[in-house]
Every structure is written in C-alpha cells, then in structure tokens.
C-alpha cells in the first residue's frame, strides 16, 4: 500500500472556507478530486488543487524509490484535513480614534493519498460486544 502525504502551511485562506473545499474531495479518487477542484468556484480550491497534485507527484516518487508499480488511477484521498494556523492581527481605524481588530486567519492543509489494499478491502466484521449490562 502506497501512502503519500502533502502539506501546505500558513496558507492565507480561512480554515472554515478551506474545510468546505476539503470536504468535497475526501474519499474520492485523486483524478476525480482534481477535476472537482478545477471547476470549484471557491477561492480555497486553487491551493487544495496544487496540494493534491503535489501528493500525486509524491506518490509517484515514493513508488519509484521503492521499485513498485503505481497506477495513479488507484490513488484516492484517504485523509484530508485543515488545521488552523497563525492568525495575523490587523487594525481597522474607526471613528473617534477607535480601532477595530481584523483577524486574518491562516490554514494548515494536509492531504493523504493511498492505494486501496486487499486487506483493507476485505475488512473483517467488527465483533459484537458480549459484555452484559448490569440489571437492577
């Protein structure tokens, strides 16, 4: 199972808006995710598009280094998440000498691509809990 990780840090997109875009591609095939992101109207779709393309390239390099065959059609977005980065604090001058604070938020975006493994495809059924409840 090939797994490749790509991260971008301190990207100037608010985490809430980035999560909206990342939620669209989670669980999809990598090529399908690129197609979705290419035509998504959100501003956060451009950095996420570049990140998925980088993760595909990372998987290709990782497969070459380990001398394994990698079919890029098999790659899918196994995990994708957005964490909040540092917040740039700016001030907006207001009337009568006041100042309002403006928070310019940043995001750390992580995308993990993986190939489906035969062991994962045939996951064993979870065992039912056999613990008995205490009766009064």
Curated annotation (Swiss-Prot):
Gene3D superfamilies: Ribosomal protein L22/L17
Family matches, as CDD domains: Ribosomal_L22 (cd00336)
Listed GO CC annotations: cytosolic large ribosomal subunit
Superkingdom of this protein's organism: Bacteria
Pfam families: Ribosomal_L22
GO molecular function annotation: rRNA binding; structural constituent of ribosome
Bridged cysteine pairs (disulfide): none
Keywords associated with the record: Ribonucleoprotein, Ribosomal protein, RNA-binding, rRNA-binding
InterPro entries: Ribosomal_uL22, Ribosomal_uL22_bac/chlpt-type, Ribosomal_uL22_bac/org-type, Ribosomal_uL22_CS, Ribosomal_uL22_sf
Biological process (GO), any one: translation
Keyword RNA-binding: yes
HAMAP family: Ribosomal_uL22_B
PANTHER family for this protein: CHLOROPLAST 50S RIBOSOMAL PROTEIN L22-RELATED, LARGE RIBOSOMAL SUBUNIT PROTEIN UL22M
Subunit structure: Part of the 50S ribosomal subunit.
Family: Belongs to the universal ribosomal protein uL22 family.
Function: This protein binds specifically to 23S rRNA; its binding is stimulated by other ribosomal proteins, e.g. L4, L17, and L20. It is important during the early stages of 50S assembly. It makes multiple contacts with different domains of the 23S rRNA in the assembled 50S subunit and ribosome. The globular domain of the protein is located near the polypeptide exit tunnel on the outside of the subunit, while an extended beta-hairpin is found that lines the wall of the exit tunnel in the center of the 70S ribosome.
Database matches in NCBIfam families: rplV_bact
Protein name: Large ribosomal subunit protein uL22
Organism whose genome encodes this protein: Leifsonia xyli subsp. xyli (strain CTCB07)
Gene it is expressed from: rplV
